[in-house]
Amino acid sequence: FDLHIRLAHRCGSLAQLGQILGQAGISLEGGGVFATGDSAEAHFLVADGERAAQVLRAAGLEVVAHTPVLVRQLNQQLPGQLGSVCARLAAHHINIHTMYSDHHNRLILVVDDVAAAAALTPEWQAQHAHP
């Protein structure tokens, strides 16, 4: 699941998030944080989105959403893979809301329709199980 959290853009916000999840035994498998102005949008890959959201909300953090993701493995030796995946989805009107990679160098995509996106991109199926 993609866990979307809105943080204050201040020193220590990300540390707080990491400590809360760590104390709850929840591992972050990939993600990123993007700050604009006074807030920061954090997206992290977790195995149990509902539990992670509950833990963070109980600690007073703003969880925007926890969403199923599409996991794909790109051939890093072949230039243009990202463009090919994105073009395939765009041609079928599937919008990509968020994209990042995980600790296994897999592409993590938050899209409009995970099932349809998966059916359209079988050649990029990730080989490893994902959270």
Can you annotate each of these PLM segments?
Residues F1-P131:
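A conserved regulatory-domain signal marking ACT and ACT-like small-molecule sensing domains
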